[in-house]
C-alpha cells in the first residue's frame, strides 16, 4: 500500500488550505516508517474494529488499514473533529487503496464526546492523540467504550511519563491513577520530532495500554475519581489535610482513611488506585 510521505502531506494541506493549528493539537506524521511502527504495535487481530482518533490527512490511517487487511476480517473507524480533513480522508483512501476503502468509516466528531452510537464497539485504539487533550480523550474513550481492550497512542513525552507512572514516582498524579482504574500502561518507544509536520517543540512517546478490571469496590468510578482529584489537588499535603474538604473536615478524613486501612499521614502520590477505591468505599459505608 502506498503510504503518505512529507510531500504528499504538505501538498494536500496546501490544496485544502489547511494550516495545522495548536488549538486542535495538529501535528501530522510525515514519515511512513513511523506510522508502520505504530500500526505494528497496535497488533491488529482478525475481527478487530480499530479506532483511530485524529487521523488528520491519513498517514496513520493508511498504515492501520494495511495492518487490518493483513490481519483479515478487521475494520477501521476514524474520528476526526475537523470537517475539512474528515471530508478529504475517504478520498485519500480511495486514491491509495481503492479496493479496501469499504473497510474504513470516517466519523466527524469530537473524541471527547463519542460513544458506541458514533463508533460502534471498537476493540483496539491506535492514535496520534492531540497533545492538548490527550489524557481527557483517552479517559473518555475508556469510559464510553467498554469494548476497547488495548491500544497504542502517541502523546507528548511528559504526558506519556505521567500515564505510565506508578505510585511513589516523581510524576505520578491524577492522570496516572485514573488511567490505572481502566488499564495498565507501559512505555512503548520514542518518536523523534523530525517525523512531524509542523515540527513540534516537544518530544513524543508511544504508550501501550491493556484494559483490566477496575478495583473491587461498591463505590462508583465518579466517587473514586473525586477522592483522586482531592488528594492530588494539594500534592504536598498529607491525605488527612488534602481530603479535609472532601470528607467535611480533616478529622473526618482521618476517620475514613483509618477505616480504609490507609495512613492519614501519607500523601496521594504514594497510593495505588485500589487505595483510593477503599477510601471512597469507606465514606459510602459510614
Predicted regions and their residues:
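Primarily a LysM-type cell-wall glycan-binding module
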Residues: 235
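Short helix-coil junctions and helix-kink-helix linkers
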Residues: 244-246
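Catalytic cores of RNA-modifying enzymes
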Residues: 1-227, 258, 262, 269, ...
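Acceptor-substrate binding/catalytic loop of class I
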Residues: 230-231
Amino acid at each position: 500500500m502506498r503510504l503518505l510521505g512529507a510531500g504528499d502531506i504538505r501538498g494536500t494541506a496546501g490544496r485544502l488550505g489547511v494550516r495545522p493549528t495548536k488549538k486542535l493539537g495538529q501535528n501530522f506524521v510525515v514519515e511512513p516508517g513511523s506510522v508502520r511502527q505504530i500500526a505494528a504495535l497496535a497488533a491488529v487481530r482478525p475481527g478487530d474494529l480499530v479506532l483511530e482518533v485524529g487521523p488528520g490527512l491519513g498517514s496513520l490511517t493508511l498504515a492501520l488499514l494495511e495492518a487490518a487487511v493483513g490481519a483479515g476480517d478487521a475494520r477501521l473507524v476514524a474520528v476526526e473533529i475537523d470537517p475539512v480533513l474528515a471530508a478529504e480522508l475517504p478520498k485519500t483512501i480511495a486514491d491509495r487503496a481503492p479496493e479496501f476503502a469499504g473497510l474504513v468509516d470516517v466519523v466527524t466528531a469530537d473524541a471527547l464526546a463519542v460513544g458506541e452510537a458514533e463508533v460502534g464497539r471498537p476493540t483496539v485504539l491506535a492514535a496520534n492523540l492531540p497533545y492538548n487533550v490527550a489524557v481527557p480523550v483517552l479517559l473518555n474513550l475508556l469510559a464510553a467504550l467498554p469494548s476497547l481492550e488495548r491500544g497504542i497512542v502517541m502523546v507528548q513525552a511528559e504526558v506519556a511519563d505521567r500515564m505510565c507512572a506508578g505510585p511513589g514516582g516523581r510524576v505520578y498524579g491524577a492522570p496516572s491513577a485514573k488511567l490505572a482504574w481502566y488499564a495498565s500502561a507501559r512505555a512503548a518507544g520514542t518518536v523523534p520530532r523530525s517525523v512531524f509536520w509542523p515540527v513540534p517543540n516537544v518530544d513524543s512517546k508511544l504508550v501501550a495500554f491493556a484494559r483490566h478490571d477496575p478495583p473491587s469496590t461498591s463505590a462508583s468510578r465518579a466517587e473514586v475519581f473525586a477522592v483522586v482529584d482531592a488528594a492530588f489537588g494539594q500534592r504536598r499535603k498529607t491525605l488527612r489535610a488534602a481530603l479535609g474538604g472532601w470528607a467535611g473536615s480533616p478529622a473526618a478524613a482521618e476517620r475514613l482513611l483509618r477505616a480504609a486501612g490507609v495512613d492519614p499521614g501519607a500523601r496521594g502520590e504514594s497510593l495505588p488506585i485500589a487505595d483510593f477505591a477503599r477510601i471512597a468505599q469507606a465514606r459510602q459505608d459510614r
